[in-house]
A protein has these predicted regions:
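Electrostatic cytochrome c docking/interface patches
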Residues: 40-75, 154-186, 201-202
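Extracytoplasmic electron-transfer domains, predominantly the class I c-type cytochrome c fold
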Residues: 54-61, 65, 93-136, 146, ...
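Conserved non-transmembrane functional hotspots
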Residues: 271-276
Length: 276
């Protein structure tokens, strides 16, 4: 029997098919599960695509308000933070609560509110809680500018499509926090930027180079980042700066268990949260 006849025999072809199928299944099983099968992988918009005229002006203003919030919206910010302190990369970084795709995701049911809310309501949630400030009018120039920026970020994404990296990475909520271990991790890994007392590093202009994690200029008790596992999920994927991913899930849970329990501004309206 010639080599070619061996390779073309039914038994050889069947064996080859089984091997190929096995290899394919191995690849599929080992591939990282980024999101649902119909999720889209977004590409970041290039600023050269911002149009000229009023629409482009609104997009640029929106980005400025979201990245320099304390200085540009002093009447609506009650602490030293900017929106981009948590929404990293001007709202483009995966697993740092990016704004990419949000235009098509809202209205959305929020368990904390116990109802369907608009994106404008979600923005105001952040202003009142994370920024310890005041809500914007839905028809204000500033709100419309923020919406314009988020719409531009989402330009290539069909409404309703799952977005890989939306929100924060999932973390095992069965992990038990140890605040004493967390205090040691904070001192070793976090204090250089956020301060030994969580006070942050001032920028000399009333804001912060690195934001405070507790105290009067930090997010209030109603903010998502004041919730233990939300903070741990953010830390796990994004901190420390320049060493993201260097902490284990347990370390992230421990350090979040430490800093979320420190004193911060109150938010009386939080008694109405999670109504269902």
């Amino acid at each position: 029997m010639t080599p070619s006849s061996v390779f073309n025999s039914p038994s050889c072809r069947a064996t080859g098919a089984r091997v190929l199928l096995s290899m394919l299944m191995t690849v599929l099983m080992c591939a990282p599960a980024l999101a649902e099968p119909d999720a889209v992988v977004y590409k970041l918009q290039d600023e050269s695509t911002i149009p000229s005229g009023p629409e482009g002006d609104a997009i640029r203003l929106g980005k400025m308000l979201l990245t320099d919030t304390r200085r540009k919206l002093p009447q609506h910010v009650g602490n030293g933070l900017n929106c981009s302190n948590c929404h990293l990369g001007a709202g483009t970084q995966p697993h740092a609560s990016p704004w990419v795709g949000l235009i098509g995701a809202f209205p959305e049911y929020r368990a904390r509110s116990g109802k369907l809310i608009s994106l404008q309501e979600r923005i105001n949630d952040c202003l009142e809680r994370s920024m310890n400030g005041k809500a914007l009018a839905f028809d204000s120039v500033e709100m419309n500018a923020m919406m314009s920026y988020m719409r531009w970020l989402s330009a290539d994404i069909a409404p309703g499509k799952p977005i890989p990296g939306r929100g924060f990475v999932k973390i095992d909520t069965r992990l038990k926090p140890d605040a004493s271990r967390g205090e040691k991790i904070y001192a070793a890994k976090c204090a250089a930027c956020h301060g030994a007392e969580g006070q942050g590093v001032p920028d000399g202009a009333g804001g912060y180079v690195f934001p405070p994690l507790w105290g009067k200029d930090a997010f209030n008790v109603g903010a998502g980042m004041a919730r233990h596992f939300t903070a741990a999920a953010f830390v796990l994927k994004n901190m420390p700066v320049g060493q993201a991913g260097s902490l284990s899930a347990q370390e992230a849970v421990d350090v979040a268990g430490y800093f979320t329990q420190q004193p911060r501004p109150d938010f009386p309206a939080s008694v109405k949260d999670w109504p269902n």
